[in-house]
Amino acid sequence: MKCVTEEKCTPPHYRGYFEKYTENILYRNYPITYISWQEAENYCEIHQGTLPTESQWMAAAGITFGIRYPWGDEEPNFALANYDGFYQGLTPAGWLPQGASPYGVLDMAGNVREWTLDPYSSDDNMGGDTDRILKGGSSSDYPQTLEITAFQWHSEKSAGFNRGFRCVYTADSVGTK
């Protein structure tokens, strides 16, 4: 990974029984996980992008269409999203095209929670690590987390099997890739 070789990110953090899939070519189309917020942001910066804000993420998921989920208002099922442990792990990017947003953006619900640029603020966070908002739910989360307006938060220093990211780009930066 370019991010690791340029020393902007540390190698993925593996815990327990999860396979070191980033080292296996069979998993090259899977989301990057076990990555902290800062490492995700560094990765995006190396590729001339940034993490999306929560508003940008919701726009890509289709919030302006007045829908509950990226694919519409139909209740989640396992043809639309990877959630609730059904697939017993992660699925490759684009595995469930029926769950695409109105803009054709894939994997906006389920598989991995996605870091956003936005910090989470609560009265309970008394000077500890900065918490960051994650969107989309994960392969181990309940269906309610798949709603476009739902969110979760974790310490920006944390990394886990259910946390990943996507980068956003300006029109100018796309031509430079």
Which residues fall in each region the model found?
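Short capping motifs at secondary-structure boundaries
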Residues: 1-12, 47-48
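Functional-site microenvironments in short loops/helix caps that host divalent-cation chemistry
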Residues: 15-152, 156-161
